[in-house]
Amino acid sequence: MPQTALEQHLLNCPIISVNVRVWHFWSFLVKHDAMRYISIIPVGAMTLLMFADLYRAWGNIEEVIINAYFAVLYFNAVLRCSILVLNHDKYEKFLMNIARIYKNLQQIEDHEIKSLLQRYTKRARMLSIANLGLGAFISTCFVVYPLFAGGRGLPYGMYIPGVNLFGTPQYEILFFLQVILTFPGCCMYIPFTSFFASCTLFGLVQVKNIQHQLRKLRIEGLKPSKLIEIIKDHQRVIDYVHDLNSLVTYICLVEFLSFGMMLCALLFLLNIIEHQAQFVIVAAYIFMIISQIYAFYWHGNELREQSMAIAKVAYGAAPWLEMKPALKKMVLLIILRAQRPLEVCETKKKKNR
C-alpha cells in the first residue's frame, strides 16, 4: 500500500520517527484500521481483571503492592493509547508541525545549527531506542520470573469469577495470553514516554537556535528584520510548548500521582520482603519507575532553564548605549517574554503572549 504524504513526512522525520513507526505499526496514529483494537481491547480487558484481583487479594500486603504495580502500569498504557487514538488528529497535526520546523532548521546554512540539530536528534533517537530495549528487557523479566519462583504463578495477577486460574488447561492458556499481550502492552506504554522526551528535546533545539541567533547579532550587527525574525521564532517556541502541554498535561498528572504512590509502596515493600529474588524484582520495578520519571522531568527541567537563559543571552548581545529606541524595545520584548519560563506542567497553564 503506498504511503500518504502525512505518513512520509512523519515516518521520515528523524527526531520522532522511532516512536511514530511503533504507533504506525499498531495503527494508533497516521494509519487508522482495526489493528489498533487487537492491542487496546485485549490489554484493556486484562487490566480490568488485574484490578479485580486487587479486590480479591486485599489484606495480603505483598501481593497487593506487586499486583497494583502491574495494574497501574497497564492502566496508564491503556489510558495513553486511548487518548492517542481519540485525539489522533491533534497529535498528527502537532507531529506535522515538528516535521515542518525540523525541515526548516535543516535548511539553515549554519554549521552550529546543523551540529545542534544532529546532536539532539541522535540523543532523542538513542533515548527512544533505549527505552524500547529497556521496556522489552523488563517485560521479559515480568513474564519469565514466575517460571523460576516455584509453584504455579501468572506474570500478572488476575481474577475471573468462577474460574480456577491454576488448573489445567486454564493456567497454560492464561499464561500464554499474558506473554503475548505483554508485547503490545509495552508498545502502548513506552513510545509515549519517548515521544514526550523527544518533543522536549526538539523544544530545546528551537530554544538554543534562538540563543545562537542572538549571539550572532553581536558579530553581524543589530538589524530590525533579524530581530523581528527572532521574535517570531520565540513566539513559535512558546506556541509549540503550549501545544505540547495540551497533549500531555493530564497524562503527566496521572503518571505523577500513580507512580508517586507506587514508588512509596514499593520502597515500603523492600523493608518487609524476605527472599532475595523478590528483592531483585522489586528493585527492577523501582528502577523502571525512576527511569520514567527521569525521562519526563529531567528534559522538562532542561527546557525550562534554557528558555530562561534566552533573556541573559539577549541582554549580553545588545550594545545598549549605541542602539536606537526601536531596537531596544524589540530586545526588551524578547527579555520580558523569557522571564516566564517554558514549562511542561501537570496542570493547565496560560500561554505566554
PLM regions and their residue ranges:
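Divalent metal-binding acidic/histidine catalytic loops
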Residues: H234, F256-L267, H275, F279, ...
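Short amphipathic alpha-helical coupling elements at transmembrane boundaries
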Residues: K93-K103, V205, N209-K216, I228-D243, ...
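Helix-loop-helix junctions within predominantly alpha-helical proteins
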Residues: M1-A68, A99-T200, V205-E229, Y250, ...
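Intracellular effector-coupling site of seven-transmembrane GPCRs
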Residues: P224-S258, K328, L333-I335
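Hydrophobic alpha-helical membrane-embedded segments
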Residues: I66-K93, G185-F202, Q292-E302
